[in-house]
């Protein structure tokens, strides 16, 4: 029996009156008891999910491209796990939308690339093309223009299966590995995720292998014209790239003509450079870059280079992929990566705010584990732009030593600093802050993994139709760094803090909100910045804060909550971003209002009321929505932990501030 059920519940009338008290600004004893019970139930449920090692880890779900690619990988290599394939196929079928295709997030519009991969995966798994669900999918794909309209990554996957000619994908020869740093394109100029995905892809796209495809499955029926006849594979690059895009596409076509002239010795040297780059970063059972697309490309590249299936490195690379699987009784899917450091740091902040002995003990166990995960003197790609900077960051995953990120590092240092045992973590915090400040970009902002990764023209190359080749500074990451720098308040960080605040002020949208690069969307970005402003001493009456608060108030729903969909990332659909309330977005809004002098507002208490009303009997909250972009407009995520720890954090923070106000 869960602990909330052991207590005597108030009558329905008493609870309704108590909630009315919340809305009318009075934290009565009855309301206080209800709030305490809600917080205790959420806290106990979260503590119960902490691992023995001290970390929290919740599922991280992506759209159907990832599980579809897992099936395609098995057929590329002819290493098919039939029971697993059957379960992944069941997952894909269950996520087909009413429009016949597959969206990038639940409830989203038809997406061509996701639909093509899901259809192909199901056909590879043995689904009859004439089955009703396959016929519906095929009709939706053809209505959208056919598989030729897929994005670059999907077209490369199809080329590897011989489904379209290689002229239908960008020219990315392995000789890119030999280019000097001053050249207009170099690996150092793109993001970590682009590097780790592209380097093994250079090998694949240069060797141009054909998948083993043991069942000889093809999808010519998804093309409106025969793929060998199709001449319009780069239509989107021409439409969206402008003059620069057309020039770069012309360079791409010219380069193909030169390819036969490349000396064999140069090709061999470049291939070996790419191979060694991958092997140096293979990262054990955590995988290249600790992200699925890079890991798949690495495994397939190793196979093409002649590594036998029992080679220890290839076995380890395959095991890294298998560890991403979430396998249930009747279905299975593959995660894009895992998020233990992020989940643990945020859950720890919620535990600290909830403030009881059990919470603080759980937080200490979590911080002790986090301390062991800090990356200090390990090599990392970030050092290419900051060669003299000492390490001190944390990665997002269990193991990803080449790629610590600033967001995780800021949140971990924040939690460590506000611990009752902060002295135990002082050296870890010092190293973290030194590293964060050293990673500030020239414009004053902070990016996720790199500094000054701002060669924006590269987003116009034919390969970059996803628009996410780079890792520039963002408001949400900058806000997190500002929060921890201001909270700790070291004198030597004042200049960096001042520059970061200037950056945040400059990034405010005309309507008062901030864009959320790593969480959906303007509610997330606005919460992040308002928390940072509060820590940095930007007062509630500041004009930027007032505009942000006014925007938040205008987005509150009639049920007291807040909600925003991933369609808010579409440039022409921003007016649609207000949607059904969610627990995590309501929690962000509540935390933002608490940080902005709105502790006595009706809006705040209505938000708290929404969170209490939607809490489940097990103490947690449930929500089906995807809550973050991997890449806006291209790839979205559902952090299953967000509805577990963010509402707890918000309720506990509301209680703390309410009691502080009452005591005064």
Name what the model sees in each region.
Residues 1-664:
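Preference for long, amphipathic alpha-helical scaffolds in soluble/luminal domains
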């Amino acid at each position: 029996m869960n602990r909330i059920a052991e207590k005597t519940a108030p009558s329905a009338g008493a609870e309704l009156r108590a909630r009315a008290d919340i809305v009318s600004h009075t934290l009565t004893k009855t309301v206080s008891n209800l709030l305490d019970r809600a917080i205790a139930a959420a806290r106990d449920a979260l503590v119960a999910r902490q691992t023995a090692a001290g970390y929290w880890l919740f599922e991280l779900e992506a759209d159907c491209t990832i599980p579809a690619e897992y099936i395609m990988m098995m057929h590329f290599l002819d290493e098919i796990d039939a029971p697993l394939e059957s379960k992944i196929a069941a997952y894909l079928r269950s996520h087909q939308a009413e429009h016949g295709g597959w969206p990038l997030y639940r409830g989203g519009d038809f997406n061509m690339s996701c639909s093509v991969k899901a259809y192909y995966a199901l056909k590879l798994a043995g689904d009859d093309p004439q089955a009703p669900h396959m016929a519906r999918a095929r009709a939706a794909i053809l209505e959208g223009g056919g598989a030729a309209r897929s994005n670059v990554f999907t077209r490369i996957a199809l080329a590897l299966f011989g489904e379209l000619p290689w002229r239908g994908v960008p020219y990315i020869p392995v000789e890119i590995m030999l280019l000097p740093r001053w050249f207009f394109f170099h690996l150092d100029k793109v993001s970590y995720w682009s590097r780790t995905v592209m380097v093994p892809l250079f090998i694949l796209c240069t060797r141009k292998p054909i998948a083993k495809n043991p069942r000889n499955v093809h999808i010519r029926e998804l093309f409106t014209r025969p793929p060998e006849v199709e001449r319009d594979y780069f239509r989107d690059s021409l439409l969206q790239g402008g003059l620069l895009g057309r020039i770069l596409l012309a360079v791409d076509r010219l380069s193909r003509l030169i390819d036969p002239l490349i000396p064999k010795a140069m090709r061999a040297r470049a291939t070996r450079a790419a191979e060694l780059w991958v092997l140096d970063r293979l990262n054990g059972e955590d995988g290249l870059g600790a992200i699925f697309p890079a890991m798949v490309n690495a495994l397939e590249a190793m196979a093409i280079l002649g590594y036998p299936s029992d080679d220890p490195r290839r076995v380890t690379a395959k095991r890294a992929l298998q560890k991403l699987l979430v396998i249930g009784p009747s279905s299975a899917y593959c995660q894009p990566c895992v998020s233990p450091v992020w989940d643990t740091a945020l859950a720890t902040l919620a535990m600290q705010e909830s403030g009881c002995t059990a919470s603080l003990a759980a937080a200490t166990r979590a911080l002790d584990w986090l301390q062991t995960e800090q990356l200090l003197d390990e090599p990392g790609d970030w050092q290419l732009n900051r060669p003299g900077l000492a390490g001190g960051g944390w990665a997002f995953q269990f193991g990803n030593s080449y790629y610590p990120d600033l967001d995780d590092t800021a949140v971990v240092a924040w939690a460590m600093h506000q611990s009752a045992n902060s002295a135990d973590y002082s050296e870890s915090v010092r190293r973290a802050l030194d590293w964060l400040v050293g990673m500030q970009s020239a414009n004053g902002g902070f990016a996720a993994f790199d500094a000054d990764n701002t060669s924006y023209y590269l987003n116009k190359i034919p390969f970059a139709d996803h628009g996410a080749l780079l890792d520039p500074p963002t408001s949400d990451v900058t806000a997190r760094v500002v929060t921890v720098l201001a909270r700790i308040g070291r004198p030597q960080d004042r200049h960096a803090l001042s520059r970061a605040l200037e950056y945040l002020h400059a990034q405010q949208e005309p309507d008062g909100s901030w864009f959320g690069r790593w969480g959906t969307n303007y509610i997330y970005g606005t919460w992040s910045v308002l928390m940072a402003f509060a820590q940095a001493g930007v007062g509630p009456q500041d004009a930027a804060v007032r505009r942000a608060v006014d925007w938040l108030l205008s987005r509150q729903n009639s049920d007291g909550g807040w909600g925003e969909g991933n369609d808010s990332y579409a440039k022409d659909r921003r007016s649609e971003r207000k949607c059904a309330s969610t627990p995590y977005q309501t929690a962000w809004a509540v935390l933002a209002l608490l940080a902005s002098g709105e502790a006595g507002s009706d809006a705040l208490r209505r938000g708290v009321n929404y969170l209490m009303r939607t809490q489940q009997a097990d103490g947690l909250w449930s929500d089906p929505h995807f809550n973050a972009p991997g890449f806006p407009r291209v790839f979205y995520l559902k952090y299953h932990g967000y509805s577990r720890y963010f509402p707890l954090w918000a309720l506990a923070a509301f209680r703390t501030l309410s009691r502080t106000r009452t005591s005064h």
